[in-house]
Structure formats: structure tokens, C-alpha cells
């Protein structure tokens, strides 16, 4: 990373964009508790959700900032992580001109969003050990490469990328390095959040859908420099996170001990499932995991997938993904769910 300047990456139209100003944005610095709001054409009769939500989700950001040791100005919230990722494309990638890089096998939405935004998507395969091939990645970079996506722990492989490889990419690439940490809470490795101030080109995405158990409310999180977050705030929809989502997130975030207990239970169930998988006759390889799932190579993925479906067990068949021929991905369930899976595996062995 040499002479990094965010202004060299922001799309020209976004630089001059005047963002939409919602009714509530104009009063964000006032004590609104006793104010009468007749500005947004809302239904005035109280039912808990008759008013528009806070467009900046200030209460949620304050809690997240305290938990992570950051400033609220380093946080953007979205309607799931996919919205956050889409905003990165729209803020920094010029259609038909720019490109991004991802490292298959990995989360498929990077490529989908690139196609939606008409941005070239370059794929540099991971190594056989599912680590970034740093030299190949950097060789693929052009002056129009805006983002490199690193999913760590990676989906579907479950492993984290080495600190050395990520650091090299951060230091040698003058675009944004987006580290997708959807599964970081299941890993013993530290988050890259502590490095935000060191690397202005570092962006981190997280979610409440995995360890926090709130997939149904759709809340994704982007952490970055205040300058990055300011750009994303310019282009985000004004009320992209609804009131019910904000309320439910606050309730959950204030109960960290329960979250920690659930994570501990999931990891314990992961270890129990690993022991059973080691005894299944058709399992050929079990890949190391730091997530709430296990990637397993079997003799015939399509056959074993169909057999489990018949027994009422739904898993993910990843055999069509690069480097994942005949691989199945098992999400870690409750103890009861895992017992059903374990019994089914024994029955089809």
C-alpha cells in the first residue's frame, strides 16, 4: 500500500453526489424526545413502528462501537451483508471499466454482485490447502482493480487465511482489501478490526446472521475508516435498516453472555461431529475448520447428498465448486439435530 488515497478509488459521480436528506437526518443533533414530528407524512397513531426508523441506526452503532473498541463513525449497517457488499461496488467500481478479485472456492455473492454491477470479476483459485496464492493475486491486479475480497474464515472451506498472506496483500495493493468475517466468532484467530487504523485500505464486513443467531432480521456490518464509511453513507438508501431489526439487534447485542454460551455449544457440537465423521466409511477427507460448518470430501457427493435428503437431512453439496469435487458442507446444528445427522450418516455408511 503506497500513497493510498481514497479519492483515487471513489467513482466520479459519487464524489459529487448530493445524498438524499431524510426528514429525520435534519434533526439528528437535537433532543427529539419531546418534539412533534409533522414532516414525513407518517401515520401519527403510535403502534411501535408508525414512524420511520433512525436512518443512521445510532443506537445500534454505539453498542457495536463499544463492543469492538471503535468509533460509530467507523461503522455502516446494511440490510444484510449482501447490501453492504453491493454498496462497495456502487461506491468504488465503475461499470465496464473496473474489476474486482475473489478467491474461489468462496462466497458466491462476490461474483453475483460484480455481474449485477457490470464489473469484471477475476477469480484466482486458492491453493490446494485453501490459502491465497499471493503472487498470482498481485499479478492479476491492474490499474482498474478496485477490490480484493478475502473471506476469512472462508466459506465453504472453513479455514482462516494466514496473517502473512493477508498482510502482504494489504501492503502491496493500492485498492481496497475487503475481509469478510462472517464466521470470525467461531475462530480462535483474532479479527482484523484491530488493524483498521494501520491500513486505510482495509474494510471488514461482519454479520449478525451466524454466531449472533439473527439471520432472519438481516443486519450486516461494515467496518472501515471514517472516510470510507462517509462515502458509503452517501449512497445507501435512507431507511435501509428497519425499526424492528434495530430493536431486535439491540436486544441481542446486550446479551453477550448468552451469545458466548451458544458459540461454545456450537464449537462443542462441531468437535462431536468431527469424531463421528472420522468413522464414516465413505468420508475421504475432513478439512480443518474454524467456522460453524465442516467441509468433507466423500466418495460420491451427489449420491450421499441424495441419501441424506431422503432421510430428511438438508446439507450443502459443493461438488461443483473449484477444488471441492465430491465435497459436502455440514452446518453445525443443535445437539438433537446433530444426533439425527450422525444416525443418518451411520445408516448410509
Each predicted region: which residue ranges?
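N-terminal "arm"/small-domain region of PLP-dependent enzymes with the aminotransferase-like
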Residues: 1-66
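PLP-dependent aminotransferase class I/II
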Residues: 201-279, 286
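Conserved PLP-binding catalytic core of the aspartate aminotransferase-like
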Residues: 266-267, 279-311
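PLP-dependent enzyme catalytic core of the Aspartate aminotransferase-like
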Residues: 164, 310-311, 321-349
Amino acid at each position: 500500500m503506497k500513497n493510498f488515497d481514497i479519492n483515487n478509488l471513489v467513482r466520479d459521480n459519487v464524489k459529487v453526489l448530493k445524498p438524499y436528506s431524510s426528514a429525520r437526518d435534519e434533526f439528528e443533533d437535537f433532543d427529539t424526545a419531546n418534539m412533534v414530528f409533522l414532516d414525513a407524512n407518517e401515520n401519527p397513531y403510535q403502534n411501535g413502528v408508525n414512524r420511520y426508523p433512525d436512518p443512521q441506526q445510532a443506537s445500534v452503532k454505539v453498542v457495536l462501537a463499544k463492543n469492538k473498541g471503535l468509533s460509530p463513525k467507523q461503522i455502516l449497517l446494511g440490510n444484510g451483508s449482501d447490501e453492504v457488499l453491493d454498496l462497495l461496488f456502487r461506491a468504488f467500481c465503475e461499470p465496464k471499466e473496473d474489476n474486482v478479485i475473489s478467491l474461489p472456492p468462496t462466497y458466491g455473492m462476490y461474483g453475483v454482485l460484480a455481474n449485477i454491477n457490470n464489473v469484471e470479476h477475476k477469480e484466482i483459485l486458492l491453493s490446494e490447502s485453501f490459502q491465497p496464492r499471493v503472487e498470482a493475486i498481485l499479478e492479476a491486479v491492474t490499474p482498474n482493480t478496485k477490490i480484493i475480497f478475502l473471506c476469512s474464515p472462508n466459506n465453504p472451506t472453513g479455514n482462516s487465511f494466514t496473517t502473512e498472506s493477508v498482510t502482504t496483500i494489504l501492503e502491496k495493493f493500492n485498492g481496497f482489501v475487503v475481509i469478510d468475517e462472517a464466521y470470525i466468532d467461531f475462530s480462535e484467530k483474532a479479527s482484523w478490526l484491530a488493524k483498521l487504523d494501520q491500513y486505510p485500505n482495509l474494510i471488514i464486513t461482519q454479520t449478525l446472521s451466524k454466531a449472533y443467531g439473527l439471520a432472519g432480521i438481516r443486519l450486516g456490518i461494515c467496518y472501515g475508516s471514517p472516510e470510507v464509511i462517509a462515502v458509503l453513507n452517501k449512497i445507501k438508501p435512507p431507511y435501509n435498516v428497519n425499526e424492528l431489526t434495530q430493536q431486535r439487534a439491540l436486544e441481542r447485542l446486550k446479551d453477550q453472555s448468552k451469545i458466548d454460551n451458544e458459540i461454545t455449544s456450537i464449537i462443542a457440537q462441531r468437535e462431536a461431529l468431527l469424531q463421528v465423521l472420522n468413522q464414516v466409511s465413505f468420508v475421504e477427507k475432513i478439512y480443518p475448520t474454524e467456522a460453524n460448518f465442516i467441509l468433507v470430501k466423500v466418495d460420491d457427493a451427489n449420491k450421499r447428498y441424495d441419501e441424506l435428503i431422503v432421510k430428511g437431512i438438508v446439507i450443502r453439496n459443493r461438488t461443483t465448486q473449484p477444488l471441492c469435487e465430491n465435497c459436502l458442507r455440514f452446518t453445525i446444528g443443535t445437539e438433537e439435530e446433530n444426533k439425527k445427522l450422525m444416525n443418518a450418516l451411520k445408516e448410509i455408511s
